[in-house]
Amino acid sequence: MPKPGFESPRGCVAIVTGSSGFVGSRLVEMLLERGAKTVIGFDVTKPDKVLEKRFEVVQKQTGGKIIVLAGSEGDLCSESAVEAAFTKAPQIDVVYHIAALVGPFHDREKYMEVNYNGTLRMIDNCRKYKVPKLVYSSSPSTRFTGGDVEGLREDQMPIPDTFLALYAETKAAGEKAVHKACCDELLTVSVAPHQVYGPYDTLFLPKLLETAGKGLLRIFGKGKNKISICYVDNYCHGLMCGADALYKSSPALATYYVVHDGPPQYFWKILNEAIVAMGFVDLETKFHLPGMLLYSIAHLCAFFTLLTGKITKLNPFTVKMLMIHRYFSLENAQRDLKYEPLLTSDEAWPKTIEWFKVNWLPQWKQQGNSNLA
């Protein structure tokens, strides 16, 4: 009997939106590694030379095929581009909708157009072209209300009436649409990671390492907050476990799951491990920034944004995310998706640090940062 996450990829034809991104690109590779016949990558961002090479290598190694639709051909905001993706093969077996507008620095209209309307376009074409499975990449931020999350299950975290960020609000709207669309002809599920990391990450770890390398990062508050983290391979595995769990009468239908590495980690501790490994100054040797001070400054920044329209990097949402506990139970994903992490944090975090030391650090220094840190 196939292991969970390995059955649906075998011989499948899949669409992966967001295929030039951190998660989407790794999902494309892992689908081929698990026997997919063809993966249609869809992303408004064109693959860079490194990703082009990665895709060439995995195709040679597996015999699978990758069709890349990028630029105007990979635009979620274009009705014609989205529909064209569904015509690239006689039958699409599964759609993995990963693409999203992320971060706190965009306006409501853009978030809605990409994260909500883009999702509606995927749903409409799944129906039109009789795609039987849709796996939606959601976010735990769709459940955040501002307080600590300590070991909760997904069923203990309903979607709130108000949201901490536009990203969360529009991702939640997309998720609701995906679940509403679930029927015998189109089976759907939502799977979210928490704090995804790994090689080729361009957001989470590099941004924090850059700030630390310039000597601008301090521990927020006491620095004892714990979080769940998710290695990128574990998340892609969770998405494929989600696809495996899409069958009639499955408990996973129209349901939301969070997957991660397992036991929670002290956020500032593991981040400091990465910082020290890069040769940067140990955060524990610097004074901590008091939480109340940070919140006061963040609210002033938010008021400044309200007055001027200029967006600052420090805002109440980002401060809160770096100070609260954010860790989740795996119980539901283990039961319904048969998900188990491929690697633990103890295995995957050191691998990731080593990758950044070898691949990211030299490039960062070449950009004129060699005398910093």
Where are these regions (language model features)?
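N-terminal Rossmann/SDR dinucleotide-binding element
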Residues: M1-V94
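Amphipathic terminal alpha-helices
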Residues: P2-E7, V13, F328-D336, E340, ...
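NAD(P)H-binding glycine-rich loop region in Rossmannoid oxidoreductase-like domains
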Residues: T62-N117, R121, N125-K128, T142-G146
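Conserved Rossmann-fold NAD(P)-dependent oxidoreductase catalytic core, especially the SDR/UDP-sugar
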Residues: H97, R121-Y167
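Catalytic helix-loop patch of NAD(P)-dependent Rossmann-fold dehydrogenases
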Residues: E113, D148-V196, L217-F220, N225
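Substrate-positioning beta->alpha
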Residues: E169, A173-G174, D201-K207, G221-A245, ...
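Conserved C-terminal active-site "lid" loop/helix of NAD(P)H-dependent oxidoreductases
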Residues: V232, L239, H299-E340
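Mid/C-terminal beta-alpha module of Rossmann-like enzyme folds, strongest
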Residues: A245-K313, P350-K351, Q363-A373
